[in-house]
Amino acid sequence: MSRYRGPRTKIIRRLGALPGLTSKILELESGYIGQSTPNKKVSQYRIRLEEKQKLRFHYGLTERQLLKYVRIARKAKGSTGQILSQTLEMRLDNIIFRLGMSPTIPGARQLVNHRHILINDNTVDIPSYNCEPKDVITVNNRKESVIIKNMDSSRKPKVPNHLTFDSIRFRGSVNQTIDRECIDLKINELLVVEYYSRQV
C-alpha cells in the first residue's frame, strides 16, 4: 500500500487529531471526529485497525514500512509498543517536525528529500534515517529562508525534552532517545502490535 496523498481533513475527521499529518484542527461538528457512532458496537478488529491507521497516517508511512518497524520492535528487548513509538519518533523527518522546522511530517520529508538537511555536517536525504543521541541537525545555508518561512507560518510547538533547538543558528541537537511520556500522539501501541501479530 502506497503512502496516502489524499485529503488530510478526511483522515482527521475519521481518526482525530494527527499533528504530524496536518496542522489543521477541525471543530467538532454535528457528526463526529475520531469517535464511533453512538450505540453502535465496534469490533475489536476495527479498534486495532484505527489505532494502526493513526500511527501510519501521523508518521506518513506505507503499510510495508510500518510492518517493518513492528518487526524490528518485536525483536528488540523491552516493551514492543514502546520501542515501536520511540523508533518512529527518532526518524529524521519526525525530528525536523518536532524541532518546529516544518509544520508537518510530510513537509519535513520534503526538506530531507531535497537535500536541505545536514546531520553532523553531512547531507542526509533519507527521511527514515534513524537519529541518535549527540546528532546535530542543521540546514543548508542556501535554504535557511525555507525554514524561516515554515517557522513563521506554523504553530510554535514546544520542543520536547530530548531535543534542543537554536532558532538563531537553525541548529537542532538530539540529547537522548525520547521518553514515551513525551510523545504527544494519543495512541495505544499495544493494539497496533496486536493488529500485526499474525504477520510478524
UniProtKB/Swiss-Prot annotation:
Annotated S4 RNA-binding domain residues: 90-150
Keyword list, A-Z: Chloroplast, Plastid, Ribonucleoprotein, Ribosomal protein, RNA-binding, rRNA-binding
GO cellular component: a single term: chloroplast
Cell inner membrane is among the record's keywords: no
Gene Ontology MF, one: structural constituent of ribosome
InterPro entries from the UniProt entry: Ribosomal_uS4, Ribosomal_uS4_bac-type, Ribosomal_uS4_CS, Ribosomal_uS4_N, S4_RNA-bd, S4_RNA-bd_sf
Signal peptide (UniProt feature, chain positions): none
Location within or outside the cell: Plastid, Chloroplast
Superkingdom as given in the UniProt entry: Eukaryota
Keyword GTP-binding tagged: no
GO BP: ribosomal small subunit biogenesis; translation
Subunit structure: Part of the 30S ribosomal subunit. Contacts protein S5. The interaction surface between S4 and S5 is involved in control of translational fidelity.
Classification via PANTHER family: 30S 40S RIBOSOMAL PROTEIN (PTHR11831), SMALL RIBOSOMAL SUBUNIT PROTEIN US4M (PTHR11831:SF4)
Role of this protein: One of the primary rRNA binding proteins, it binds directly to 16S rRNA where it nucleates assembly of the body of the 30S subunit. With S5 and S12 plays an important role in translational accuracy.
Family: Belongs to the universal ribosomal protein uS4 family.
Protein name: Small ribosomal subunit protein uS4c
Higher taxonomy: Eukaryota, Viridiplantae, Streptophyta, Embryophyta, Marchantiophyta
